Curated annotation (Swiss-Prot):
NCBIfam families: rpsG_bact. This is Small ribosomal subunit protein uS7. Part of the 30S ribosomal subunit. Contacts proteins S9 and S11. Belongs to the universal ribosomal protein uS7 family. GO terms for biological process: translation. One of its GO terms (cellular component) is small ribosomal subunit. The gene is rpsG.
Amino acid sequence: MPRRRVIGQRKILPDPKFKSELLAKFVNIVMVDGKKSTAEKIVYGALELMAEKSGKDHLAVFEEALENIRPSVEVKSRRVGGSTYQVPVEVRPVRRNALAMRWLVEAARKRGEKSMAQRLANEMLDASENKGTSVKKREDVHRMADANKAFAHYRW
């Protein structure tokens, strides 16, 4: 292994409008081909639509939606003596957020509404009410982990 110094993780700047680091990360996940200003328009537009429909605070609904999508356990493949087991492992907090945001954007992209802002807003509203594709994804991951609970002792 190289003996160079370990490079620390880059500090992400909070987004300019709401001063939220989580929202800045979300904008980066929505971003395609480096078009950050377009991604910001989409995210801020979605937050406006969401606040309009729900009558709640922008960030409150966003946080609630993410909370309902965050997985607590996932399965990782592990080879033991020629066979591969799906071993349930706990998800680290940073990865929880990353997975939740990624699943939210993936689910929004698959929706049928006209604009991406509308899709994102509706998916976040659904997620905040514990329904929608992104919440289903989390439940599928949890179900997989539950089904493979017998292999939990193979953790590393």
